[in-house]
Amino acid sequence: MFNFKPLLTITLLAVSSVASAAEQALDAQQVAQLIEKADCYRLQDDSSKVVSLVRLYQDQELDKTRLYHVYTRPNRESLVVFKSAVEAGQKMLMMGDNYWLQMPKSRRPIRITPMQKLLGEASIGDISTLTWSQDYQGEWKATETLTINGQSIAAYRLALTAKTKGASYQKIDLWLSEQDAFPIKADLYLRSGKLAKQAQYGRATNRGEDYVSEMTLLDSIQPSKKTVIEYQEIVPWQLDNKFYNPSYLPKANTSEL
């Protein structure tokens, strides 16, 4: 159970690749195990409540913030409740490959895609999906060395390819720590093959357990902007089944969620 502020943020400063002719490629099963372990740093319980604060920075100055409560459960199902005053009454439901957005006073939800933007570079998919193993098939590419805060960290570079229609990205290049499979950074690609954004993952520790405290999203086209998704609270939570029904969204009272 997590209910605390991040203690440490990791920032990527430079990257250098070290290829070794003697390095051993990981097989599909080993890669799958690595991805599942990386998922555990992001979400430990299948059914959880995640309080996510999204901050948009312009030229290193805080520009806007938005708050979301995300209720996730197995089988790729999530309910996102918009908590900021400017978005009050909005809610989004993800059911597998399908996404619905409910606007205040609207009679029915509208279908959307996981790439619909919320704030800055943060999209619906970035908020509602906290795991990779269910949406992507992984492949080992190389063992590389990343230089982070002046320290060299050995990392596995994996290529993830979408295996579900509702996956936010078609392809992800993901770097995991060789020591403990903690996610370090990722390049996120659209179906067109275009690089959509880059992600960096912050590490924090509580009671001896490491977890992903935040995700920083960077856009190479607009380097003056960055979006930070901070996971302020992650707790086990069982939400009533009725909230995972798109037809219930218009009448669902989520003010207390």
Each language-model region and where it sits:
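A short, sequence-level motif marking secondary-structure junctions
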Residues: 70-74, 96-98, 115-119, 202-205, ...
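N-terminal signal peptide c-region/cleavage motif recognized by signal peptidases
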Residues: 16-20
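Mid-chain, structured segments of secreted extracytoplasmic proteins
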Residues: 68-111
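Flexible, processing/modification-adjacent segments and terminal tails
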Residues: 22-46, 53, 62, 96-170, ...
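Gly/Pro-enriched, hydrophobic low-complexity segments
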Residues: 112, 151-246
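Bacterial N-terminal signal peptides that target proteins for export
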Residues: 1-8
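Sequence/structural signature of outer-membrane beta-barrel proteins
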Residues: 57-59
